[in-house]
Structures are given as C-alpha cells and as structure tokens.
C-alpha cells in the first residue's frame, strides 16, 4: 500500500456518527433499538422551507454561484445577527459553508500554523481536537468539573496559555453538556483573550435552543470590543431541523473571511445553491416553528431529568439548552454484566446498554470525559420513558 500522509495517522471516525450508525444497523436487522445517540432534531424540516427550496429548483437555481454564497442569504444572516444579538455585520463578513462543520474547518486551516496551540474546554464537541490536528496544530484541553457547571477555573485556563497559544474555541449552549456559559465566565475569557492576543471561535450552532427562552448570547454580548478577534459559527441544522441540507456559515472580519473563502474555493466551492434559498427563507420567515421545537425540547429535558433521577448512581446537571444531557455513570464502573464482562469505562458502559437494553448513547470519552455518557432527547417522550425503564433494568443486573 502507498504511504499515507502523517497528518491523518491519528484521524479517527466520529464517535457520535459511529454509535448512530450501529444503532441504525441494528434497526435495519429488525432489532428494536431506542436511539438516544443522535445529534440531530427528530423533527422534519418545516414545509415552508422545503417549498422555498423546490421553488428555487423550479426557478433554475441549479448553476454555480459565488463561493461565499448567495448575496440574499448573506444579507439575511446579517439581519438575523442584528435582530437576535444586536451585532451589525456586512455580507462581505459572511461565508456560507457546507454545514457549520466546514466553517470551523476552514477557519482552523486559515489560522493555524504547525505547532500552534488552540485551547479547548472539556467536555467538548468531538471534532474540535481532530480538526486542529489535521491543520497541524495542537489541541490544549482544559478540564472542568460538573461541580462547577463545566466552567473551568480561569486560572486553570491561563496556566494552559503559552507563547504558542493562538486561540480558544467556545461552544454555548454546549454539546455535550447542554449547559450555557455564565456572563461572568465569558467576561473572564474576554480578559484572557485581550491579555494574550488570542482569537475566539464561537460555535453558536445551538444558540436558539435555550430553555430560558431568552435571546441568544455569546462572548461578544459581554465584550463587544472583541469584534475583530471573535469569529462566529452557526447554521440551520439544529435550529430549523435541516441537518441534511448542510448549510452553515462563518462570520467575522472580512480579511479572514476572504482567506476562508479562498480555501473553500479550492475544495468544495459554494454550498448547494438551492439549499441556500431554503436557509434564507428559514432565517427571514416567522421563527414560531423554532420556538415550538425549543419548547418541546425543554419539556423533554425536564421529563428525562425527572426519570433519570430515579436511577441510583447516575448524576447530572439538568440541561439548559440543546437536546443533550450529560450523565455521570462512573458509579457503575468495575461492575460486571450477567455474562461476566466488566464495565470499565464509558465505551463498555455504552456497549452494554446497546447490547442489553437496546438503548444507544454516546460514550463520554468522545467528548473528553470518560466518566460520562451523552444522552440525546431528540426522541419522543414515549421512547424516552421506555429507554429509561430499559436502562434501569439493565443497570440493575450489574454486580
């Protein structure tokens, strides 16, 4: 076999996608699996968005367009930022990408030189460290505890800053914890950013899924003077149940946006043209469907929290947003299954639930914390109730 590039030797498949794929494979075999591993809403894309896409196809929006995206969509993104956050951006400060994931990847490729360090707060979304490594950077993981709402001590973050540190990635509401960073914490991060001249990549993909139903916030909300240092990632996937449409965006200073656009122009070019029209309608139409979906997720979060409290040995903080709950399950480690297999970590715990209870969850090690598993409540209340019963029964068999 020919020699592979050194930079991809540590590349691993996405753990979340792997678990979801295994659960779906079991279902295809006729096995009843309750999938609580999914990273996407269980709702369908609203009809008015689909109709806009169909119309775009009928109108002939099927040719190449400019790499940064439709001007009308970029204007809609700017307007949405001003409405939701009070931030003013111009279309040349927006790059439309093939999902928010590409926005992150473009930015990291544009800003990281070999050996540069980027701070990541644990627990983190699975792809951050891998993307940094592909860009030949070094992910510096800063650990946090559930007891402190997964907000690391600012002193601990500062200890991890070296002359090689160039930036920090923030994600709030968080995947996997479902928690929202406090204003006080964000202000502290802002001071470190100023002190050490860092950039901030703010992954706001879940910003509308807040269970306090307040307007979205990010670090610019508490430190607007950081505008030139903050780059915002968002998209339509989670908020509008459009994961398969693959439309995201990066917003920030036009100099960096132009570089990211050049990178994209040499890889995928523009995101799908007619899908962009659907995204535009999603942003410019009534947001009532978003509010309805968020309300349902809030109700499910409350239900799941109540149900899990009945299982001894499982600890968690009730989610404040997203559609995830991060549950500490390490109390069950070192126990054995009825077949004599030891539960050693979050992977073996998750495998046991899938094999014994037919419930799929994601091992916490994928997010940087092996004591936890991520449970998605992007599923019906009926299935959530069934799943918790099955989990409780399976855990009761451990010795």
Question: What are these model-derived regions, one by one?
Answer:
Residues 19, 36, 52, 58-64, ...:
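Glycine-rich loop-to-alpha-helix module at the N-terminal edge of alpha/beta enzyme cores
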Residues 64-97:
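Conserved N-terminal alpha-helix of the aminotransferase class I/II PLP-enzyme fold
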Residues 8:
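Substrate/cofactor-recognition hotspot
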């Amino acid at each position: 076999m020919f020699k592979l590039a050194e930079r991809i030797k540590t590349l691993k498949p996405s753990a979340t996608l792997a678990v979801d794929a295994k659960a779906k494979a079991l279902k295809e075999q006729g096995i009843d699996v309750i999938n609580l591993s999914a990273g996407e809403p269980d709702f369908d894309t609203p009809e008015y968005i689909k109709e806009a896409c169909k119309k775009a196809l009928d109108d002939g929006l099927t040719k190449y367009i400019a790499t940064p995206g439709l001007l009308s969509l970029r204007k809609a993104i700017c307007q949405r930022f001003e409405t939701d956050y009070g931030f003013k951006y111009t279309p040349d400060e927006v790059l439309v990408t093939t999902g928010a994931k590409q926005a992150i990847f473009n930015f990291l490729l544009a800003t990281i030189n070999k050996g540069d360090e980027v701070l990541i707060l644990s627990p983190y979304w699975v792809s951050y460290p891998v993307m940094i490594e592909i860009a030949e950077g070094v992910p510096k993981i800063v650990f946090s505890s559930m007891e402190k709402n997964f907000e690391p001590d600012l002193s601990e973050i500062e200890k991890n800053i070296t002359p090689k540190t160039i930036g920090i990635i923030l994600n709030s509401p968080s995947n996997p914890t479902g928690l929202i960073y406090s204003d006080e914490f964000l202000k502290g991060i802002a001071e470190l950013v100023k002190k050490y001249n860092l950039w901030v990549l703010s992954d706001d993909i879940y910003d509308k899924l807040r269970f306090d139903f307040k307007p979205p916030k990010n670090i610019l909300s508490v430190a607007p003077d950081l505008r030139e240092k903050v780059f915002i990632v968002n998209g339509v996937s989670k908020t509008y149940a459009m994961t398969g449409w693959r439309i995201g965006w990066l917003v920030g200073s036009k100099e960096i946006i132009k570089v990211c656009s050049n990178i994209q122009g040499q890889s995928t070019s523009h995101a799908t043209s007619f899908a962009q029209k659907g995204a535009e309608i999603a942003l410019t139409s009534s947001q009532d469907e978003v509010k309805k979906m968020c309300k349902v997720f809030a109700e499910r979060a409350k239900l799941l929290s109540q149900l899990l409290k009945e299982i001894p040995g499982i600890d968690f903080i009730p989610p404040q947003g997203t559609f995830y709950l991060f549950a500490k399950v390490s109390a069950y480690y070192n126990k054995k299954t009825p077949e004599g297999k030891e539960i050693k970590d979050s992977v073996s715990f998750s495998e046991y639930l899938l094999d014994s209870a037919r419930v799929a969850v994601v091992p916490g090690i994928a997010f940087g914390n092996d004591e936890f598993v991520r449970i998605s409540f992007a599923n019906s209340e009926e299935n959530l109730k069934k799943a918790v019963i099955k989990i409780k029964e399976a855990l009761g068999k451990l010795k």
